[in-house]
């Protein structure tokens, strides 16, 4: 019934000229800054018209209002009896009047400002505090909803513009008749201005408006401010989406007048979407207005004290459902009520989800922090059924204040605010613990079917007030108090999953035995008895504490309750106990003792042990006979935990009732008999040290000595001079905690912290406790030195047992404990190269003794990354960078072998060079190991010669002797260490190495220039091979070498040397002709050639596994992926060696490289793979 002026707008001018004054209640709330955490629902009823004349008999009154009680009474007019009839004469089917109460009740006599102040008093402060707020007007069409939301003079039916005297149809609405929407705009901006002045926070307000058709449920929501989107500046959402949840247009509104202007524009767009812009002239019904959702988005932020930024967004929704609740295509009012009930109660899937109004309402009302004010509208003139349905829906929403929200609560302060809310609010007070949205697990309470609970949580029972002892602890039984929460000691005791399972299983078995008719009585009495009962036997007391902690109503068995006990029986009363009246102070003392018991830490299987005692016993626990001062028993006496259990400290028979854990007298007797039996067995054995050093035997004896100490109280004490000398050698090793010792059974199981050192014979005990002995620093030092010496002797014996018989002649030159010293920093590789060229008259190299060091137990720290890959060469490192000098020796020797074969060469090992194992390691650039270390190992099984050319290859010993490097073979150790006493030779190494990665044009000339010394080299080779035995020669692996007539193999011959990729693991030296067999390093430079000049170095071509080249002679086809071609000794002899290479056997090297750990019979061919 509002005027067309108020529906068309004009609120911008009204707020400019006469803004509505802020109500005093709202001003107080804004100044107090209350915390609005949890949202509330406030439901009000407004009767928009005046009551009809009571004298009219045709239209009897069915609605009675009581503003004082805020109550409305509805009476069915069909059941209204005439005045002459009495109430007792009504028929039995006549219904009684229905009464409904609300948070507030308004009639036509109430001012518009009072209605707006009551509706917005909690919504606006909540928005300024960061929560959402919503004002919703609901009812059937033409019941006064536009009047409440927008304003107007309903009584006169004339426009507010005429009342102001302006006479224009577009004049502003009078200030006294402004609705909730313009008042909310004015009061919100006024509150923002005050908040900005007080706190310094910054605010930004944006406006959006959405309309929903009342008669077209399939139509989409309409953005009513889309026409202003292009004109607005800095609009964050300028694109219109299909639905409201995607985001409507938000227009910036820096002032209240600007926001009111947007409200006027939204109202104009609402009328257009409804299909009519004016009231119909003919007396037909007015068109149904579409629903309006006008939203003020408040963005605020402020700087905190610590320099951070705090803020966020809150929204104020003003919703006018208009004519949506109609019976001509729209939702009925009952459907809207069901949607509101589902959203406000926290349901995820409200009904009528296909209607465009449903997602809009859910977006506005669903947040838990949203404060909702609902104004239901009825009229006296409407039918009884319509008024009843409207009031019933509003009453159902109003009763939701006693229901709890089913959505998680974001702020903890909101719960406190919700619990302390006033009586006028009707929202839930906290989060519902039964909601599945709070946690991932859904908890279903299967409790008793009684009136104490609504099925959502276990009942909270109060102790009986008739019991005198229970009155003092009644407050503790309230919800959230100490008795409802589990005690702290039960958290410590039941922290492990195994203990929780056992306790729950025991509780479940006892719950099954409960009678079904008394589910509450024993719980009440036991909750009272848990705090005031006397301490029981520890086993029974722990069971009782577990029952109380789990909340299971388990009665105490009668056989566990004595007459003198304070534990109440199921039929007993605290007032009937013997000690209740005789000793009034005894109950208090017992209560205090019980509370002390509760506060202390309780162990399930033994007494408590503090960390201080553990730290104190670390250096005294490992005595010779393993006697511990504070020995902890798994089931031992708690009262003797701080004393020694040796030498007559065992508890007497009368002290068993003092608390002996789970062990009764029978079990104690059995253990004592077992100790005696074990002690007698120990004494029958000789008292000498066992020759075996196995840990099992040692620890078994230690366990016997440990048990022997429990049954020898009559032994004499030791002389005092022996006390400080017999500390064990094990006391400086790591000790386990007492908790680990407690887990061991009292038999001879192994102790994990015992070392390999010897154990002295058993010593008698002395009566005085170990803590009284004086332990000086000298005695500790002597004990430590004895322990170290014993460990060294033990290690030396183990090393000596592993050494071979050929190395025993060097044992007398070394001390008893062998320690390796890394000398790689003192001896450079350049010095090693100079030493290689020294004179031959030196009979013994200073480092030759280091080649017989199989018993070195430590590896150099410079090559710790190089691990052993097989047993036969676990410390060997093959590196052919130092053998570059042998190139010309090989070429000359093989050239002479073609012309005048020597008998000495044929006396070498007949086994193929490819049957010898060659090892490959990844040696880094920082390694000092630049040459191989050859270990004298037994020769592998000899393989039959597969070609005549295999026997013509010289052995490595002969090659080394020819090159003058007989001492160099013994230079390097398996761990890469060198002798620091290596003398510096001034004689330079004449034939220098060449850079591996360069091409040297002078190699040919250097090779031809040195051909004149071949006869001398041949003579020396014959002498060495005659002197050395065949077995010694066969121990060193033979090297497959590529003998080429050229001094440099460029690798460009595609038939012999395939090119590798740029990123291949073989590296560039494989491409340039330098092929290391299986030990090529991934680095591009040699550590030996790093200090040499590039102009004087010569190349060498050594066939290997990395480069893809072929071996000499018979080694060509033995390499799996190699090309089956080889370079001959001369260019004219290439064809001659090619058929030898093809027929030279296919076994040995490649198969070993493929499987270096299990190559016993190298019969097959394999591929070479990079590590």
From Swiss-Prot:
GO CC entries = cytoplasm; microtubule
> What GO terms describe the biological role, i.e. biological process, of this protein?
microtubule-based movement
Stretches with biased composition (Basic residues): 805-816, 1124-1139
Keyword Iron-sulfur present in the record's keywords: the answer is no
Asked if ATP-binding is a keyword of the record, the answer is yes
SUPFAM superfamilies reported in the protein's UniProt record: P-loop containing nucleoside triphosphate hydrolases
Localization per Swiss-Prot or TrEMBL: Cytoplasm, Cytoskeleton
**Kinesin motor domain ranges (all copies):** 40-400
Q: Where is the composition biased (Polar residues)?
A: 1043-1059
In the record, what terms sit under GO molecular function?
A: ATP binding; microtubule binding; microtubule motor activity
Q: Where do the record's region annotations for Disordered lie?
A: 1-24, 737-774, 798-820, 932-955, 1043-1099, 1124-1143
Q: PANTHER family recorded for this chain?
A: KINESIN-LIKE PROTEIN CG14535
**UniProt record similarity statement:** Belongs to the TRAFAC class myosin-kinesin ATPase superfamily. Kinesin family. KIF26 subfamily.
Q: What is this protein called?
A: Kinesin-like protein GA13060
């Amino acid at each position: 019934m509002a005027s067309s002026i108020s529906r068309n707008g004009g609120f911008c001018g009204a707020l400019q000229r006469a803004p509505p004054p802020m109500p005093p209640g709202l001003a107080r709330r804004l100044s107090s800054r209350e915390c609005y955490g949890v949202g509330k629902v406030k439901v009000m009823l407004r009767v928009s018209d005046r009551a009809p004349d009571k004298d009219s008999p045709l239209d009897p009154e069915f609605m009675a209002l009581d503003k004082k009680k805020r109550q409305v009474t509805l009476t069915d007019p069909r059941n209204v009896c005439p005045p002459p009839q009495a109430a007792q004469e009504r028929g039995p089917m006549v219904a009684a009047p229905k009464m409904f109460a609300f948070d507030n009740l308004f009639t036509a006599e109430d001012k518009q400002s009072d209605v707006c102040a009551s509706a917005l008093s909690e919504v606006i402060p909540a928005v300024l505090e960061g929560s959402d707020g919503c004002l919703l007007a609901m009812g059937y069409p033409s019941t006064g909803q536009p009047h409440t939301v927008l304003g107007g003079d309903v009584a006169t039916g004339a426009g507010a513009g005429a009342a102001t005297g302006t006479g224009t149809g577009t004049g502003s609405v009078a200030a006294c008749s402004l609705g909730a929407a313009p008042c909310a705009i004015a009061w919100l901006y006024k509150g923002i201005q005050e908040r900005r002045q007080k706190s310094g926070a910054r605010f930004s307000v944006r406006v959006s408006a959405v309309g929903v058709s009342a008669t077209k449920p399939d139509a989409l929501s309409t953005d009513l401010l889309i026409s202003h989107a292009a004109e607005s500046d800095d609009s964050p959402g300028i694109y219109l989406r299909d639905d409201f949840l995607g985001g409507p247009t938000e227009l910036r509104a820096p002032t209240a007048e600007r926001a009111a202007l947007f409200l006027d524009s939204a109202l104009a767009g609402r009328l257009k979407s409804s299909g009519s812009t004016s009231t119909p002239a003919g007396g037909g019904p007015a068109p149904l207005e579409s629903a309006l959702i006008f939203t003020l988005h408040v963005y605020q932020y402020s700087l905190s004290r610590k320099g951070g930024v705090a803020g966020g967004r809150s929204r104020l929704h003003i919703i006018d459902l208009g004519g949506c609740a109609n019976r001509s295509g729209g939702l009925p009012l009952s459907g809207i009520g069901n949607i509101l009930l589902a959203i406000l109660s926290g349901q995820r899937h409200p009904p009528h989800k296909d209607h465009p109004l449903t997602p809009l309402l859910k977006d506005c009302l669903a947040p838990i922090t949203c404060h909702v004010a609902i104004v239901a509208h009825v009229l006296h003139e409407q039918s009884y059924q319509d008024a009843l349905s409207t009031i019933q829906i509003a009453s159902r929403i109003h009763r939701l204040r006693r229901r709890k929200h089913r959505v998680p609560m974001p702020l903890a302060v909101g719960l406190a605010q919700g619990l302390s809310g006033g009586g006028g609010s009707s929202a839930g007070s906290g989060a519902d613990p039964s909601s599945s949205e709070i946690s991932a697990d859904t908890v279903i309470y299967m409790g008793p079917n009684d009136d104490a609970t609504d099925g959502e949580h276990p009942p909270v029972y109060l102790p009986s007030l008739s019991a005198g002892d229970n009155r003092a602890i009644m407050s503790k039984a309230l919800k959230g108090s100490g008795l409802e929460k589990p005690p702290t000691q039960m958290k410590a005791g039941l922290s492990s999953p195994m203990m929780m399972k056992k306790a729950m299983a025991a509780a479940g078995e006892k719950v099954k035995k409960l009678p079904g008719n008394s589910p509450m009585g024993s719980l009440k009495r036991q909750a009272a008895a848990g705090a005031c009962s006397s301490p029981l036997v520890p086993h029974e007391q722990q069971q009782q504490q577990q029952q109380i902690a789990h909340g299971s109503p388990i009665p105490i068995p009668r056989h566990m309750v004595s007459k003198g006990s304070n534990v109440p029986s199921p039929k007993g009363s605290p007032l009937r106990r013997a000690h209740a009246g005789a000793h009034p102070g005894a109950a208090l003392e017992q209560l205090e003792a019980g509370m002390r018991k509760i506060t202390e830490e309780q162990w399930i299987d033994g007494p408590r042990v503090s960390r201080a005692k553990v730290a104190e016993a670390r250096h005294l626990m490992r005595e010779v006979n393993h006697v511990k001062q504070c020995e902890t028993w798994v089931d031992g006496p708690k009262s003797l935990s701080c004393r020694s259990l040796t030498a007559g400290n065992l508890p007497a028979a009368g002290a068993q009732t003092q608390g002996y854990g789970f062990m009764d007298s029978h079990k104690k007797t059995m253990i004592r008999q077992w100790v005696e039996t074990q002690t007698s067995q120990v004494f029958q054995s000789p008292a000498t040290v066992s020759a075996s050093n196995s840990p099992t035997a040692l620890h078994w004896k230690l366990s016997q000595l440990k048990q022997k100490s429990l049954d020898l109280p009559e032994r004499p004490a030791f002389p005092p001079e022996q006390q400080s000398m017999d500390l064990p050698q094990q006391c400086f090793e790591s000790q386990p905690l007492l908790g680990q010792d407690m887990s061991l059974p009292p038999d001879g199981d192994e102790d994990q912290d015992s070392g390999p050192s010897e154990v002295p014979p058993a010593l008698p005990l002395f009566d005085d406790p170990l803590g009284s002995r004086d332990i000086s620093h000298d005695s500790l030092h002597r004990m430590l030195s004895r322990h170290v010496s014993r460990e060294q002797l033990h290690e030396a014996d183990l090393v000596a047992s592993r050494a071979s018989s050929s190395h025993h002649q060097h044992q007398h030159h070394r001390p008893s404990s062998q320690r390796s010293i890394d000398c790689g920093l003192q001896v450079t590789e350049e010095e090693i190269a100079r030493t290689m060229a020294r004179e031959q008259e030196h009979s013994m190299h200073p480092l030759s003794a280091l080649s017989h060091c199989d018993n070195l137990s430590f590896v150099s720290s410079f090559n710790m990354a190089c691990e052993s890959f097989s047993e036969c060469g676990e410390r060997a490192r093959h590196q052919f960078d130092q053998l570059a000098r042998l190139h010309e020796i090989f070429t000359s020797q093989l050239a002479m072998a073609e012309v005048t074969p020597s008998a000495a060469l044929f006396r070498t090992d007949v086994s193929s060079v490819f049957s010898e194992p060659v090892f490959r390691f990844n040696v880094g650039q920082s390694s000092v190991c630049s040459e191989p270390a050859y270990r004298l190992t037994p020769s592998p099984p000899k393989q039959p010669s597969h070609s005549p050319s295999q026997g013509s290859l010289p052995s490595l010993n002969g090659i080394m002797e020819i090159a003058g490097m007989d001492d160099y073979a013994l230079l390097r150790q398996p761990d890469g260490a060198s002798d620091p006493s290596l003398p510096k030779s001034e004689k330079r190494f004449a034939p220098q190495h060449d850079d591996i990665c360069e091409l040297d044009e002078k190699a040919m000339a250097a090779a031809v220039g040195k051909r004149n010394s071949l006869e001398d080299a041949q003579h020396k080779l014959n002498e060495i091979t005659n002197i050395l035995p065949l077995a010694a020669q066969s121990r060193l692996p033979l090297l497959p070498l590529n003998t080429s007539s050229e001094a440099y193999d460029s690798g460009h011959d595609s038939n012999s040397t395939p090119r590798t990729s740029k990123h291949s693991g073989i590296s560039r030296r494989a491409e340039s002709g330098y092929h290391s067999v299986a030990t090529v390093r991934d680095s591009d430079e040699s550590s030996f050639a790093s200090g040499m000049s590039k102009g004087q170095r010569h190349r060498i071509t050594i066939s290997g596994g990395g480069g893809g080249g072929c071996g000499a002679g018979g080694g060509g086809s033995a390499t799996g992926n190699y090309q089956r071609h080889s370079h001959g000794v001369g260019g004219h002899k290439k064809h001659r060696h090619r058929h030898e290479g093809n027929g030279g056997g296919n076994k040995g090297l490649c198969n070993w490289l493929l499987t270096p750990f299990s190559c016993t019979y190298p019969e097959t061919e394999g591929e070479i793979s990079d590590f």
